[in-house]
Amino acid sequence: MKRSKSSRRWLDEHVNDPFVKRAQKDGLRSRSSYKLIELNEKDKLIRPGMLVMDLGSAPGGWSQVAGGIVGEKGRVLATDILPMGGLDNVDFVQGDFTEDAVFQQILDMLDGRQPDLIVSDIAPNISGVAAADQAASMYLVELTLDMVRQVLKPGGNYVVKVFQGEGSDEFLKDVRSSFEKVVIRKPEASRPRSREVYLVAKGFKG
């Protein structure tokens, strides 16, 4: 089957991507790990002993970074509809976190605790239809904000990937209504032509 120009371009970029090569060398699960590493260096998000939740975690790039920082006295609770291999200091729930049974499983694992930080690098399966992809992306990030409002510790922090486009400004306002401070970051590991940015929201109002 002949590949489309866009898929060929992605493959060429991926093969030659310095962050892909670096991830392989450093033993990290994905190039996206470096996005969280950079965000953490700038915004001091993760500390040893913390409880972190990772929404849309597979293949585990962010959970791997967070688990390494929180250490044995901390914990990362990760969830995704896709399977994810085991990682140190990480508990994983497979399923759709908006479904009652999966949400209850997450609550059971929290056991009354509230996360200090919720992170999400979640993205929909891309269809190639820009308007549909943007709508799907905004729907997913709104679901992560719903989870934040249900379980995040007051004063806690939230990091989420957003694709700039229809609905993103309204989502930013919505996040700002629930947090003391929100900044927009574009990590070095984000591909230059990507519309993705990361909202770093601090001081959940509860």
Swiss-Prot record:
It is found in: Cytoplasm. One of its GO terms (molecular function) is rRNA (uridine-2'-O-)-methyltransferase activity. S-adenosyl-L-methionine binds at G60, W62, D80, D96, D121. Disulfide bonds: none annotated. InterPro entries: RNA_methyltr_RlmE, RNA_MeTrfase_FtsJ_dom, rRNA-MeTfrase_E, SAM-dependent_MTases_sf. Keywords: Cytoplasm, Methyltransferase, rRNA processing, S-adenosyl-L-methionine, Transferase. GO terms for cellular component: cytoplasm. Its EC number is 2.1.1.166. The active site is at K161 (proton acceptor). It catalyses: uridine(2552) in 23S rRNA + S-adenosyl-L-methionine = 2'-O-methyluridine(2552) in 23S rRNA + S-adenosyl-L-homocysteine + H(+). Gene3D superfamilies: Vaccinia Virus protein VP39. Its main location: cytoplasm. Specifically methylates the uridine in position 2552 of 23S rRNA at the 2'-O position of the ribose in the fully assembled 50S ribosomal subunit. Belongs to the class I-like SAM-binding methyltransferase superfamily. RNA methyltransferase RlmE family. NCBIfam families: PRK11188.1. This is Ribosomal RNA large subunit methyltransferase E. It comes from Stutzerimonas stutzeri (strain A1501). The gene is rlmE.
